[in-house]
Structures are given as structure tokens and as C-alpha cells.
């Protein structure tokens, strides 16, 4: 039998030591990677439970294994709460990731070689929206759409390509697009031309849940998402859909692309969805957007360019060319100052993908730890201070000291 009193630090000191160092890093650094956030202690506790021991192939009430009466309760709670948050007719909480959620929809409604419209990765889309290096781009005939001359989603291009290529499915959503997406307009283009409409809100889900970003569920046939990022849950995926396609989607996930679901993760999803239904989460989502606006506006005042001219969400792309520094260099020097970002290509980027001319910034994590407009403005100025003098080690050290003061005042996990 196992001894409950035998803890990780005793069983595996090497793993424990690495985890402790990561805990310190998360507490000390300002996290600005748009796809990252902090899960609550309750979410992490749920994910660390004995539910990891249970196989539960199938769905609540229709399992291929015995002993599922309690995991059935947990999964049904997750389904019901997710539907309540977004107003969905049906939902599947079993996808292990956002990528698998997208793959599940594709498997449910497409055949290899079918034509699909998706946002170009180079202009803000995601790998799973038809990038040539991804399975989606290898299995299906994806036609990319992008931005217009003002770096706004080119709806006229979407309509033109739809009429020309007659896709079976149109995919909306992005990993690096700062503005609102007109889901109603996209749905009209799709449905008027006989196409199905899917929206990937992996980045925006928490904002949608909090009423700070448009909800695509009333307009789309399928809505996929991750459960981490702005939703602050465990790493995983979900699919929401119209009731008439629920059976096809469920079959695509299991037995189509997955076997037994991760019940400990589904428990953590259920907890996160309960948190997302709270008034406090509504306030959080609104603050994420407020912080992003201040961050973007301050960076512009300091001589940087924001792609699309502004942000209407949690995320922004920063064009670094005015500062004469690449995204790769900026990521490294900001990291030395304890500000964590990721290099990111900008539209029509002349640099290679591993170098880039931009960085992507997001405010979900900083907002979770209690940053408001004043801290967002300070953070933007600290970023600009580093980028103005990226090779001045004394300057970087001074910024790092100010970052450490700020993060010590507003810890991620307080008492």
C-alpha cells in the first residue's frame, strides 16, 4: 500500500527541486505570454486527486468500464457548467487539448481533401487552422485568409474566397489577433454559401465568459477552446456545438481520436468552470481588457507600434522595428529583466520564424496576480526601458529590481 505521508520531496528530490525553482520563477517574473495564466489552488488540487487512477471510456451513463458512478458526476458537472457559461446547446469536455478539440470537429464533419477556410498562421491564425506543417494542413485543403491593409481581418476576402473555393467549413479564431472578430458576419458568409462555421476561442474564452469579448456560440455550428489561457483552468480542451451534431462530435472524440478521458483533468475543468461563473471572474475578464489597453497605449507613447493599431482583447503584437531589435533579442533581454514574453512574427515579417520582428504580449496572467491599470502602465514603461537600451546590463538590472519589487507586492499565490 502507499503511505500518504510520503511526499514528493522525499520520493523524488530532483523533480521537487525543479518544481520549487519554477514556483520562484513564476512568482518573481511578470508573465506576459498571452497563452499563459495561473490556475487556482482548487483547480490544481482537483487535478492532483485519485481520479487520475480511473479509466472511463465513453460518456456519463454510457461507459465501457464499471466503477464510473462518481466520475460520471464530475464529468456531468463540467458539461453543465460549460453550457451555462457560454449558452451552448451541447458540450464535450474530454479533448485533451485545444488541438485535439479542433481535430475532433474536423473528423466529425470533414473527409480528407475537403476544402476549409482558415486564418493564415503568418497573419495571426493557429497551427491547427491549416498550417502546412500541421496535420490539419496535410489532411485537408485549407485556403488561408488574412488581414487587410489596415491589419484588420479581411471579411471581404473571406467572402470572396468562400464564393471561389466553396469550402465545407470556415474556421474563425486566432492566436495573435488583437481586435474583435465579427462572428455574426463570418457565420452569415459561411451559411449563405453552404458552409459550416467553427470558431476557435482558445485565446478569448475567459473574456467571452466574463462578457468582455463577443460570444460566438449563438452564431457558430461548433466552438472549440482550451481550458487554460484566459479561462484559468487546467491544460485541456472542450467543444461546444449545436444539439444536432453532438453525436457526431462525441463519436469523433471517442472512439475517433482518444481513448480513456483524463478524469482528474475533467474534475479540474469543472472547478474552473464554477469559478468562471462567479461575479469575481466577470470583474477579472473586464480588468484583463482594461490592462491590455493601458499596456498598448503606453508602449505606443514610448515609440513602439501595435499591430492593428490597438487591442480590443487581452493580446497585442508589438512591432519592434522602430527600436531596431528582433523578437528573439527582445525575448532574451526582457527575460533577463524578469519580464517573460514570446517572440512572434508580425504580418509580412521579413525575419525568419525563429527570429521575428515582433513580440506577443498578453495580460491574463498579470491580471490574475492583481495588476491593474497603474501596474500595467508601469510594466509597459519597464518593457520600453529595456528595449531602449537592450545591451546596457546596468539598465537591465535596474528594471529587474523594480520588477521584483512589484511581483513581491502582488504575489500569485498569497496567504
UniProtKB/Swiss-Prot annotation:
Encoding gene (name): glyA2
Cofactor names: pyridoxal 5'-phosphate
Subcellular location: Cytoplasm
Reactions catalysed: (6R)-5,10-methylene-5,6,7,8-tetrahydrofolate + glycine + H2O = (6S)-5,6,7,8-tetrahydrofolate + L-serine
GO molecular function: glycine hydroxymethyltransferase activity; pyridoxal phosphate binding
Residues bearing the modification N6-(pyridoxal phosphate)lysine: 229
HAMAP family hit by this protein: SHMT
UniProt subunit comment: Homodimer.
Family: Belongs to the SHMT family.
Top-level taxon of the source organism: Bacteria
Primary location recorded for the protein, binned into one broad class: cytoplasm
Record-marked site positions (Plays an important role in substrate specificity): 228
Record's function text: Catalyzes the reversible interconversion of serine and glycine with tetrahydrofolate (THF) serving as the one-carbon carrier. This reaction serves as the major source of one-carbon groups required for the biosynthesis of purines, thymidylate, methionine, and other important biomolecules. Also exhibits THF-independent aldolase activity toward beta-hydroxyamino acids, producing glycine and aldehydes, via a retro-aldol mechanism.
Pathway: One-carbon metabolism; tetrahydrofolate interconversion; Amino-acid biosynthesis; glycine biosynthesis; glycine from L-serine: step 1/1
Chain positions recorded as (6S)-5,6,7,8-tetrahydrofolate binding sites: 121, 125-127
Alphabetical keyword list: Amino-acid biosynthesis, Cytoplasm, One-carbon metabolism, Pyridoxal phosphate, Transferase
A GO BP entry: tetrahydrofolate interconversion
Protein name as catalogued: Serine hydroxymethyltransferase 2
Enzyme Commission designation: 2.1.2.1
CC terms in the record's Gene Ontology section: cytosol
Stretches that traverse the bilayer: none
Amino acid at each position: 500500500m502507499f503511505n500518504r505521508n510520503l511526499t514528493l520531496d522525499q520520493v523524488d528530490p530532483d523533480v521537487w527541486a525543479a518544481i520549487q525553482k519554477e514556483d520562484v520563477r513564476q512568482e518573481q517574473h511578470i508573465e506576459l505570454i498571452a497563452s499563459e495564466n495561473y490556475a487556482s489552488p482548487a483547480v490544481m488540487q482537483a487535478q492532483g486527486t485519485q481520479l487520475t487512477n480511473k479509466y472511463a471510456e465513453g460518456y456519463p451513463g454510457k461507459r465501457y468500464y464499471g466503477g464510473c458512478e462518481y466520475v460520471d458526476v464530475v464529468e456531468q458537472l463540467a458539461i453543465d457548467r460549460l453550457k451555462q457559461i457560454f449558452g451552448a446547446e451541447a458540450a464535450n469536455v474530454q479533448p485533451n487539448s485545444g488541438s485535439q478539440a479542433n481535430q475532433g470537429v474536423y473528423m466529425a464533419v470533414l473527409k480528407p481533401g475537403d476544402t476549409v477556410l482558415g486564418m493564415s498562421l503568418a497573419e495571426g491564425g493557429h497551427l491547427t487552422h491549416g498550417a502546412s506543417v500541421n496535420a490539419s494542413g496535410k489532411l485537408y485543403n485549407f485556403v488561408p485568409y488574412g488581414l487587410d491593409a489596415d491589419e484588420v481581418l479581411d471579411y471581404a476576402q473571406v467572402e470572396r474566397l468562400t464564393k471561389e473555393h466553396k469550402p465545407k467549413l470556415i474556421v474563425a479564431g486566432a492566436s495573435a489577433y488583437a481586435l474583435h472578430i465579427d462572428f455574426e458576419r463570418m457565420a452569415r458568409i459561411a451559411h449563405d454559401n453552404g458552409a459550416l462555421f467553427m470558431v476557435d476561442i482558445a485565446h478569448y474564452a475567459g473574456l467571452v465568459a466574463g462578457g468582455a469579448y463577443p460570444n460566438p456560440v449563438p452564431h457558430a455550428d461548433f466552438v472549440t477552446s482550451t481550458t487554460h489561457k484566459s479561462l484559468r483552468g487546467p491544460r485541456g480542451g472542450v467543444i461546444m456545438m449545436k444539439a444536432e451534431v453532438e453525436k457526431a462530435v462525441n463519436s469523433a472524440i471517442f472512439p475517433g481520436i482518444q481513448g480513456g478521458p483524463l478524469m482528474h483533468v475533467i474534475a479540474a475543468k469543472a472547478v474552473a468552470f464554477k469559478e468562471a461563473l462567479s461575479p469575481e471572474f466577470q470583474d477579472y475578464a473586464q480588468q484583463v481588457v482594461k490592462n491590455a489597453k493601458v499596456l498598448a497605449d503606453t508602449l505606443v507613447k514610448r515609440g513602439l507600434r501595435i499591430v492593428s493599431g490597438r487591442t480590443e482583447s487581452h493580446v497585442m503584437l508589438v512591432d519592434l522595428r522602430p527600436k531596431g531589435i528582433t523578437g528573439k533579442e527582445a525575448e532574451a533581454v526582457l527575460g533577463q529583466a524578469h519580464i517573460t514574453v514570446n517572440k512572434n512574427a508580425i504580418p509580412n515579417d521579413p525575419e525568419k520564424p525563429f527570429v521575428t520582428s515582433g513580440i506577443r504580449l498578453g495580460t491574463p496572467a498579470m491580471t490574475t496576480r492583481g495588476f491593474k491599470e497603474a501596474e500595467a502602465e508601469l510594466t509597459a514603461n519597464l518593457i520600453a526601458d529595456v528595449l531602449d537600451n537592450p545591451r546596457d546590463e546596468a539598465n537591465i538590472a535596474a528594471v529587474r529590481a523594480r520588477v521584483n519589487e512589484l511581483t513581491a507586492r502582488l504575489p500569485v499565490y498569497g496567504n
